[in-house]
């Protein structure tokens, strides 16, 4: 899989943290999923440090557009993986609330990712 630069991983990780926080419950399991994403793209960096930086960015910003601009620049393969990781974080508590669904619709629209593909990824994860 294509690797991402550190700045992109931090930005996307901040978006994952945002998705985890949107239901106002940020669990250890969700943190672990974000760290798993970080380790996938940045093998040599400390995932805990990257996560902390992403959490700080998320706490100080609510600029969805900044996060999605990072995603938009990547090939379809990477976009699909990011959407998959966002859904993993969202469904990790076995519940999808209206804010989480709305967030995913907005993100997919902003990165020009079809609703159909987004739904297929979600269903695949729910059925696995």
Per-range role (PLM):
Residues 1-128:
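Small-residue-enriched hydrophobic alpha-helices in membranes
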